[in-house]
Design a protein with these regions (language model features):
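Glutamate identity and glutamate-enriched acidic tracts
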Residues: 7-9, 25-26, 43, 59
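Regulatory hinge/linker segments at domain boundaries
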Residues: 1-9, 66-67
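Short alpha-helical "packing" element that flanks the helix-turn-helix/winged-helix DNA-binding module
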Residues: 7-10, 14, 53
């Protein structure tokens, strides 16, 4: 599971609780692009939604596989 730099940025903002619109504004990308990044992140993390992605993020950080 290798996230691109941009996917990692999106994931970190997701973990902070930002909405898709807020992530789009923060990164100066379209909402469509944000959704595409999230879909890719979910697939790579083998999760189905935002909550599972956040849980998986913290599991990976704890295992030192993601910082």
């Amino acid at each position: 599971m290798l996230l691109t730099n941009r996917e990692y940025e999106v994931l970190k903002l997701l973990v902070k609780g930002l909405s898709n619109n807020q992530i789009s504004e923060e990164l100066n990308i379209t909402n469509h692009t944000t959704k595409a990044h999230l879909s890719s992140i979910y697939e790579k993390l083998k999760v189905a939604n935002r909550v599972q992605a956040v849980v998986k993020y913290f599991e990976l950080v704890k295992q030192k596989q993601l910082l």
